[in-house]
Amino acid sequence: MSFDPLPGTLENLLEQTSLKWIFVGGKGGVGKTTTSCSLAIQMSKVRSSVLLISTDPAHNLSDAFGTKFGKDARKVPGFDNLSAMEIDPNLSIQEMTEQADQQNPNNPLSGMMQDLAFTIPGIDEALAFAEILKQIKSMEFDCVIFDTAPTGHTLRFLNFPTVLEKALGKLGGLSSRFGPMINQMGSIMGVNANEQDLFGKMESMRANISEVNKQFKNPDLTTFVCVCISEFLSLYETERMIQELTSYEIDTHNIVVNQLLLDPNTTCPQCMARRKMQQKYLAQIEELYEDFHVVKVPQVPAEVRGTEALKSFSEMLVKPYVYPTSGKE
């Protein structure tokens, strides 16, 4: 049974006032960062405070806005209520380990305990994720938008709360089994092993992570915006991503299709061939995802860099693009 297609804009996200977490992701090179920056600009018009955070080690936010961002949130120039930050999960866990070493520089068991903890698959990235959430929570933003790493990393990132909850359970078991032995070894060697420092810190994250896990699975609070281009590989990757998001119980009902050639009157042979291919895959996207908001964004003539260019691009996410019927752009 067919029904009228949903509006091809992201206006629905602006209207959903309960949203707290918005993830933007897709294959590399499809305009993911441009889309997340533009969405953040539009959200800042309707929310009191918005944080745009990059978890992609490539860190394109700085390039997009032409302003250097780092691991601490700072205001985006030209906005009073939009901040941005760039975090490398791998660096975060490295810093956490260094801090532990600085606190116990003479403890020979400190490294052993960390090695023991980090043998659990995914625990390093999961702990880094917990550190990110801790920072965000202390800042009290009304809405947080994640510019995520390319697809595979994104899906792993979204599964971190579950990984961490399981890991903490395992660590709790390790603590009860090996804690007395470690303390005994410490007393023999004349040092304070204090394994509770490490296990205690991880255990204290459990309630926090458990709450976030629930929020991520609540469609009133969390959604994922898929970004793609109208080509076979991108369509395939988007389908795989949506299936995995569904298995993680994470809501997704918006797809942004970038770089479309929409001029029906072009006489350029290469453009005509590419447009024909794009129209074929666009028809498949619309058929597969008839219950999604499919946002069609045209190929723009220049790179979208700088605040003004992003503001202009962002309008195409909230108003359906109509190709001019006469004259040239």
UniProtKB/Swiss-Prot annotation:
Its EC number is 3.6.-.-. The gene is get3. One of its GO terms (molecular function) is identical protein binding. Its main location: cytoplasm. Zn(2+) binds at C268, C271. GO terms for biological process: tail-anchored membrane protein insertion into ER membrane. ATPase required for the post-translational delivery of tail-anchored (TA) proteins to the endoplasmic reticulum. Recognizes and selectively binds the transmembrane domain of TA proteins in the cytosol. This complex then targets to the endoplasmic reticulum by membrane-bound receptors, where the tail-anchored protein is released for insertion. This process is regulated by ATP binding and hydrolysis. ATP binding drives the homodimer towards the closed dimer state, facilitating recognition of newly synthesized TA membrane proteins. ATP hydrolysis is required for insertion. ATP binds at K27, G28, G29, V30, G31, K32, T33, T34, E231, N258. Keywords: ATP-binding, Cytoplasm, Endoplasmic reticulum, Hydrolase, Metal-binding, Nucleotide-binding, Nucleus, Transport, Zinc. It comes from the Eukaryota. Homodimer. GO terms for cellular component: cytosol; GET complex; nucleus. It is an enzyme of class 3 (hydrolase). It comes from Schizosaccharomyces pombe (strain 972 / ATCC 24843). The keyword Ion transport does not apply. The keyword Hydrolase applies. It is found in: Cytoplasm; Endoplasmic reticulum; Nucleus. InterPro entries: Anion-transp_ATPase-like_dom, ATPase_ArsA/GET3, ATPase_ArsA/GET3_euk, P-loop_NTPase. The active site is at D56. HAMAP family: Asna1_Get3. This is ATPase get3. Pfam families: ArsA_ATPase. Belongs to the arsA ATPase family. SUPFAM superfamilies: P-loop containing nucleoside triphosphate hydrolases.
